[in-house]
Amino acid sequence: MKTTINQVYKHTGEEVMIGAWVANKRSSGKIAFLQLRDGTGFIQGVVVKAEVEEDIFQIAKSVTQETSLYVKGIVKEDERSPLGYELAVTSIEVIHEATDYPITPKEHGTEFLMDHRHLWLRSKRQHAIMKIRNEIIRATYEFFNKEGFVKVDPPILTGSAPEGTTELFATKYFDEDAFLSQSGQLYMEAAAMALGKVFSFGPTFRAEKSKTKRHLIEFWMIEPEMAFVEFEENLEVQENYVAYIVQSVLEHCKIELNTLGRDTSKLEQIKAPFPRITYDKAIEFLKEKGFDDIEWGDDFGAPHETAIAESYDKPVFITHYPTSLKPFYMQPAKDRDDVVLCADLIAPEGYGEIIGGSERVHDMDLLEERLKEHGLDSDAYKWYAELRQYGSVPHSGFGLGLERTVAWISGAPHVRETIPFPRLLNRLYP
């Protein structure tokens, strides 16, 4: 019976065949232990000299790391195994012998591992992080489908920058200038006026010359937009969504979280509603904590966000930022025009902002005024402004950065471990 490692529980006491790679091995005179992996998981294969042919035992003793095999064996329950099972090996067929595999069980430096990222992905830790990433993506689609959202794919090549920044990757679009997308938000707003509630999931590109553990040059975002939804309801969608994906990871990635040594008690507390603090109150709090480098009108840096997050055991919304700090498309508060109806969701444990969202400007005159204030070319945004000309309604949305979210939930120390092939300031290889 051919099966995969994650399905062996269905075959207790039976002989199965698994296609696998040797992640590690150890042996004594009469027994060999093979740590096998097949992409679905890891299992220990036990080869007892007295119970197999001599040539099979010799293969087990001499097999090299990452050699590919077909292994047959009896599935046995084993409480000591994270999987709960082991394989009593009866035969081994070598598919391809690996020689001089560069990533050995010893410690390696970060640059070495990044140069060999195409191989580092095979390690138990990286495998666990990728499985958690996959579960977050799966749960994202499940959540938004259940909530009646329509998946929409905005363009990656654009003729304008959604936030009017200079941190763009420029390219030529035949005879025109074009840019790699920083966000699909403006297009998602258009889609929301057609379909009501929409979301996108795709790559974004920001030419930020940053080397922090929170930043990537290419990263993936989930960007929902909702017609007839105002600020508070937008926050409720965000907290319900984040709580949903955390609980899904807890349910479906127990082995992976255990592999990573993640303290799941901290994740078990992540349930809606999340606490809220206004920007004004956050400034007061930071000053009380001794941060003399921050004044009203300044943006928060990583130390400020971490200090605020440490006061809560859940993600916290920082709301109502100064208008001057935020992009042109954010709706001003009803009672004061110096702040906007926006929120950043700050993850616990020092992982920083994972969501930025706001109610969007829905008045055409105000939008045109904001474009002028930000020095943006109104012609480039003509189509976007027209959304306010034909049945404009209050609408809101947000963007969640996938890699930061994966880092927080998995406990990864750096976002470079949360995407298969990270693009960093000085890294475009492999």
Swiss-Prot record:
This is Asparagine--tRNA ligase. Disulfide bonds: none annotated. Its main location: cytoplasm. The keyword Phosphoprotein does not apply. Homodimer. It comes from Bacillus velezensis (strain DSM 23117 / BGSC 10A6 / LMG 26770 / FZB42) (Bacillus amyloliquefaciens subsp. plantarum). Pfam families: tRNA-synt_2, tRNA_anti-codon. The gene is asnS. It catalyses: tRNA(Asn) + L-asparagine + ATP = L-asparaginyl-tRNA(Asn) + AMP + diphosphate + H(+).
